[in-house]
Amino acid sequence: MTFILAIDQGTTSSRAILFDGEMRRVATAQREFTQHFPEAGWVEHDAEEIWQTTVEVCREVIAGQGIGPEQIAGIGITNQRETTVVWDKAGGAPVHRAIVWQDRRTAAICERLRHAGCEDDFTAQTGLLLDPYFSGTKVKWILDTVPGARDRAAAGELLFGTIDSFLIWRLTGGRVHASDATNAARTLMFDIHQGEWSKDICELLDVPMSMLPEVRDCAADFGTTDLFGGQVPILGVAGDQQAATIGQACFQPGMMKSTYGTGCFALLNTGTQPVASQNRLLTTIAYQLDGQRTYALEGSIFIAGAAVQWLRDGLGIIENAAQSGALAARADPAQNVILVPAFTGLGAPYWKPDCRGAMFGLTRNSGPAEFCKAALESVAYQTRDLWEAMQGDWGADADVILRVDGGMSASDWAMQGLADRLGAPVDRPVMQETTALGAAWLAGMRAGVYPDQAGFAATWALDARFTPKMVEGDREAAYRRWKAAVAAAMMV
């Protein structure tokens, strides 16, 4: 029997998922790792711990199924995007902890570049905005801050990579320094129109181009690893949100998916032509196959599932995320408590890194149920913000059905609330492991085990469709209250 091994390296855990030749999940292993918060607004990971947990989960699923390396046709990697690692080319040791996508320490660098009139240049080439979210200013910070790092980088002694690139380097024993187009497109240094690193942008950031990985298709040869008992090829790579877009089979222009994990990330396929957003969305690469780039509009929300984690860990009003829907359903419908969950700033379409969370509409009767309802509704309202922006950029032909995945999509209450606040149907697929499936399909398709795009799209199956039940007048009044709350939070 033939298998595909998917590595899903996320923000809070490393996972390995083994798929069989029919794209069925047969085994999963997961290890959480430590989150480091050395200062307010800073988030770091130990890249060595990421590496160790990744190897451990891979070995666990392989051993658990009792299979040999010759039965694994390929490895597909998907990863948290933007998170930045700089490591020693000779020994492979990181020179600093990985700076996570959520980290806001480079806000001042972004502001200086913005004041210098550089943002239009960045956006024109990369499709991105000047924000600490992206990798470029994180690399600059490491080179400027770690003693000797800038000189070593100039001498060609240091390498940069997002998590995929670091894992590929380690898996191949340092033989391959490469990334894929979707991860490169999130660095703030990649020209998404030319499909190459931008010399001009790298000069603005003072990042030597010798540090940068080679950029390849999402389904390509990324070398082989011998860490699992024999030679196994690495054949697929995509950033987590792009992998979910692939896993949701959003291959046609106008199709849209939204993934609900720690944050929420919505992508709308725009086909082979990039669409420049007029609503402060991101223009990015959805996937690149056979040298052909397919583009997307993306909206990034920093806090989605993390709001539910706050209910559990910060307020202690639930013991686990699965309880959130039932508690929210008990909220007083006469109350209009609104949470603006700007715990790490606001993402699209506002891009306010200094904004902080706020709650509005509290009364003496507001309690755990109302707080829980407000947290879940905040995710729906933020998705509505992205929905409106994407409709504005793409036009009337945008798909009126949203495909959803991620942990929060398992909640019927939350998904019904999402449909109500969007005023549009929400589709949840049978296969919820869309991110891992996307990575597995890339590797399996490259290996000749899995079908082509059309064949893969035909396997997508609906679990549940949530249709709007909210009266339109009530929906629009509630959305106006949300917009007013966001405006107030940004003024504090």
UniProtKB/Swiss-Prot annotation:
Please state the Enzyme Commission number of this protein. Answer: 2.7.1.30
* InterPro entries registered for this protein in UniProt: ATPase_NBD, Carb_kinase_FGGY, Carb_kinase_FGGY_CS, FGGY_C, FGGY_N, Glycerol_kin
Tagged with keyword Nucleotide-binding: yes
The residues that the entry says bind ADP are T11, R15, T262, G305, G407
GO molecular function term, any single one: ATP binding
Gene3D superfamilies, A to Z:
3.30.420.40
Q: What class of enzyme is it?
A: transferase
A GO CC annotation recorded here is:
cytosol
What modulates its activity?
A: Inhibited by fructose 1,6-bisphosphate (FBP).
Q: Which domain of life is it from?
A: Bacteria
Phosphoprotein among keywords: no
The family assignment reads:
Belongs to the FGGY kinase family.
**Name the record gives this protein:** Glycerol kinase
Organism phylogeny: Bacteria, Pseudomonadati, Pseudomonadota, Alphaproteobacteria, Rhodobacterales
